[in-house]
């Protein structure tokens, strides 16, 4: 996929959350400039300064700069003279958005822009009415499935592998895939509905499979370990770091999990993809990071981003049926992607136990998830009361048929209790009857006077009643 000539010569700024306290919010801004253009000038209150070069790829130069803004209801920065207000106040009342699944597997960039990005526009209107301080993006920020096949040697991925690649072939494939990934990100970042939010609300993002390719980590080991597979992963990882973290350099290999401690709040984002294999969800580094971010002492509230739902129906029943009968074999990778897979049950219990222990220790813990293109909520009983999971998916992905949502709802009625004496239950959204709501959606988390609540915004039905969490 070539870089479209119709793209503007400058795209951005995009804001990334780097930290904050009672006095300031720490940020990073990213601006893409077509090669040959002047460096963008950033003014964060101390006069304009040229933004340093972070990366160059596919005909664009990417400029990134770290800066801080004082805590305020409407702090301001400017890029090339265009000013943007940011709500940097992190103490007291707080509004946080959560989105996931920003695209579709096939033909996503061919969709009508206004239709595709209708919920981004709705999120922008919600922000304009009552500003957000943070936007969390929980996975599948792009659907790069087509980009992984952007070179003839990759056209059959993942079923038809080309065999070992020479150094020249690897370089050629890398360049083709890098160009395709870059074109997709730039096209999406240039969309006005996304750009409005991205310049005004700093984001913290964690990837999932479609940011690489459908089912990454749950595919056959020979595909994951092939020269083509490792090249695809390297391209996707570099693209994630640049576009979703604003980092142009390379980082040490391993998991990309991260957490931020803010006033009264920790945001924890485990990486469930970098070390994933058919037989595991996380490797040693991922578990080291996750154990640390879920350990006490912690602020009074922890939001845990699990790109794949941690509390869900008994999908292992469906997985058993597929494995025994061979029916619906094409869904085996999707089923193995789930925490509930037979292959991951021990890890799932370990993850749930860490969540439960943190919650029971006095830190109110809430799981945020996406991935399923539906909205729902769930609870797991703990000694300190119910631990909530809130699922919002997707902001751009077309919802599945109602029959699929009903089937999942029937499966959810079986219940599940991977931890003895701590049953998991799935629930309808406030004011709704079905367990799963099949409308495009995003989630708003609000802290008011120290109390937290969640509100889903649904494309057709509007905002739900608040759910106290």
List the predicted regions and their residue ranges.
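Metal-dependent phosphoester/phosphodiester hydrolase catalytic core
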Residues: 1-469
